[in-house]
Amino acid sequence: ELSRGLGDVYKRQYLNKIDVLKNHINRGDVYEANFCFEWFSEHAKINPLYVYKNLNKISKSPMSVYFKNKKLHLICSSPERYLKRNNNKLISQPIKGTSRRDIDFVIDKKLKDNLSLDPKERSENIMIVDLVRNDMSRFSKPGSVKVKELCEVYPFKQVHQMISTIESKVDSSLKISKIIEGSFPMGSMTGAPKVKAMKIIDELEETKRGLYSGAVGFIDPYGNFDFNVVIRSLIYDSESKHLSFHVGSAITAKSKGVNEYDECLLKGKAMILSLT
């Protein structure tokens, strides 16, 4: 049985924290912050690989991964790319903006169109695009940082997502460590300005994120790499039987706490279904 995040008691606590966060925004401390909370079970007995396969039937995503490190298992169906390098080209694809899918084609198209035109969702996305552009400009060739797609809406199995694509060119001698140091943690999971947003959400969030909102990927022998953003993910300790997942959303001045809470429930739906 999963606890935290379910029921009226935690919902009230969540809404109170959103009010505190919006006070920071209204004071000008930050423009946007990604606030997350955790659902967990302390006595879960699952087959991690089976749950991963089940999750990817329910919510097939392009940046999914199953990763095992001794007793820890990451069961991830992420739709989001943090950063990809192909020779001298870098690509980042932050996600901000989510709406549900519907089995009715007409309703589903309307949901997609509404997301595409939603001024709040577009504002959230554009703020993070600006942050990513700034991060990438630290190590990219001057004038090479370009926004290739802005606020494009893509359908996934469970949700519609608003995605932007930023590209740049880097010197062939640039070390991977410099790229990661200059851009991690990713703006879509922190906020803007990044450092101040991180300090505020660290104070407000009740549990540490751990691997959640981090990145998993590969590096080839030529220095090319591809990393996801660890979201829509279950993390399982097969020794202690602790199972958890985080969900979150971007908070801005226009955010309504009840709507943000509902968005978190939507994002958590596939993880819950994968366990049944």
What are these regions (language model features)?
Residues 84-157, 238-276:
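Cytosolic ligand/metal-binding cores
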Residues 11-24:
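Phosphate-interacting basic helix/loop segments used at nucleotide- and nucleic-acid interfaces
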Residues 1-10:
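Single conserved hydrophobic/aromatic residue that forms the stacking wall/gate
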Residues 68-71, 78-79, 84-89, 140-142, ...:
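Short acidic-glycine loop/turn motifs at beta-strand connectors
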Residues 162-276:
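Conserved hydrophobic core element of enzyme catalytic domains
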